């Protein structure tokens, strides 16, 4: 159940299993529905993740000049786009044309056209997230190096819906910050309600364009899907820090990103 009891533009609240957990609320930016700050989350040692360090987002397609200014005023100077080349060629990211912003493309899985699906849709996205952790580890490592190089700015990372590739990235960042898994799962779950209208339109578009009947699980953000990724991360690597070290991210870069997340 979603209950917004905050006057903040950024932080809302989610009640999950009778436990109140703060969850980021979308910024008021036109044409995006899931641009959210990773700040404001409690860590296991009692700290709070910093605001204006990281924004997770869906694609800001057709964004207006006013909302570009909103993002610049928010501090965004680095954008990491996780979409495939096919997606980028089909719909370029308008933020790449802003002179003040450093734009990076780190292609990861395209859930609608990628050969990684072998011509079929997955039963659930949890298996896709595990695949991302295994097969996109190098690009995840590159992304955290980019973040470390932009330590004094707000870093925005996006895919198309801001759910899957962006969700795994957010999971790694929050895990690195020391945020507990329950809070990470709540942050993930919010996407489905934020993007519901968009997802319904995408289902129709994919059917018409590719002739694919997309299962509901592809558009859902049920907690068990990200839980699968967290469980796999912990079993194989232990935590996000060990995962990033295995991805050839330097200890110094990890230290910097941690300092961006928490004091």
Residue ranges and their predicted role:
Residues 2-156, 168-263:
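Cys-dependent protein tyrosine phosphatase-like superfamily
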Residues 161, 165-166:
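Ser/Thr-glycine-rich phosphate-binding loops at phosphate-binding pockets of nucleotides
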């Amino acid at each position: 159940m979603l209950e917004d009891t905050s006057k903040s533009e950024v932080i809302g609240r989610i009640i999950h299993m009778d436990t109140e957990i703060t969850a980021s609320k979308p910024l008021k930016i036109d044409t995006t529905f899931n641009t959210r700050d990773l700040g404001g989350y409690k860590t296991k040692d009692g700290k709070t993740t910093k605001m204006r360090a990281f924004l997770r987002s869906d694609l800001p397609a057709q964004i207006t000049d006013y909302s570009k200014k909103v993002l610049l005023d928010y501090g965004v100077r680095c954008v990491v786009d996780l979409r495939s080349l096919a997606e980028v060629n089909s719909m370029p990211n308008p933020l790449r044309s802003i002179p003040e912003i450093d734009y990076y493309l780190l292609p990861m899985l395209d859930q609608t056209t990628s050969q990684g699906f072998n011509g079929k849709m997955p039963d659930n996205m949890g298996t896709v997230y595990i695949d991302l952790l295994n097969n996109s580890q190098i690009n995840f490592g590159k992304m955290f190096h980019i973040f470390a190089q932009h330590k004094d700015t707000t870093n925005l990372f996006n895919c198309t819906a801001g759910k899957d590739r962006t969700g795994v990235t957010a999971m790694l960042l929050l895990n690195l910050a020391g945020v507990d898994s329950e809070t990470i799962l709540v942050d993930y779950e919010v996407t489905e309600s934020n993007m519901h209208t968009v997802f319904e339109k995408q289902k129709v578009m994919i059917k018409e364009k590719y002739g694919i009947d997309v299962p509901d699980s592809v558009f859902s953000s049920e907690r068990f899907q990200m839980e699968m990724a967290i469980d796999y991360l912990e079993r194989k690597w232990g935590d996000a820090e060990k995962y990033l070290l295995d991805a050839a991210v330097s200890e110094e870069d990890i230290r910097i990103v941690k300092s961006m997340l928490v004091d």
